[in-house]
Amino acid sequence: MQNKRMITILGPTASGKTAVAAALALRTDGEIISADSRQVYRRMDIGTGKDLADYVVDGQPIPYHLIDIAEPGTKYNLFQYQQDFHEAYDDICSRGKLPILCGGTGLYIEAVLGGYQLSPVPQNQPLRDALAGKSLAELTEMLVELKRCNGSNMHNQTDVDTAQRAIRAIEIETYNLENPTPERQLPPVDSLIVGINIDRDLRREKITRRLKARLDDGMADEIRALIGEGIDPEDLIYYGLEYKFITEYVVGRLSFDEMFRQLEIAIHQFAKRQMTWFRGMERRGYTIHWIDAKLPMEEKVEAICKLMQDA
């Protein structure tokens, strides 16, 4: 597999990174590969913030990949993402287009850029049974110790905001400890990395405004429809953030005000953890060229094009 130049555009939630990637794609004849761990799911549109209108620029639809590729209720994982990414990446390159990786899931981004060596991890039912009933705090403590043994930075607190996710993370770390040899190695991908840097106060303001708008647009009804299809509410809670708190509201565990307050706090915390991950990437040797989110779109695209020329 031949490495080709790729552009990566990353940033926290509400930074406007998708619109930047789409504008850049129009300018450079590119196609976007999503790096969002929840936008892979079909019919989970409002809650995951797909904002598909961003993929139309000046009336031109921008091709995108790895959105709407999995069914709600399933548990898409990092190993699957790596395989799907390389399939999309090779396809885009084979047609002479520019791949533009865009998203806020730092784990997915770093996994494909760095060529993380992963194996598909089977379910370990005896382990799951042994962990059942433990609190999230207890599970997190176990996960931290397993990560220490593995020398792993593959998971952070972003990934274990529910007990179910923590158990799966422990299952993965346990498997990797017992099976250190990967089944398949994927190459690192050479990429210019651009970060959209949004002021903390502006980010918080946009998060709150966007949350209100999405609730007005029917985010709770979207979740009711998924439950109406027969999807277990606990499987929706597994996805975290909007799906965790709004599902708990829909099934009667939280009032609307409790849901809104807790969800707003959780999204702010999530955005902060995203930035912590990106700063960690810089410490791990990745160069991220930060661009001010407040710049006009044309200036942002020009700045990225100049970086591409200088690379």
What would you call each of these model-derived segments?
Residues M1-A311:
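Phosphate/pyrophosphate-binding catalytic cores of soluble transferases and nucleic-acid-acting enzymes
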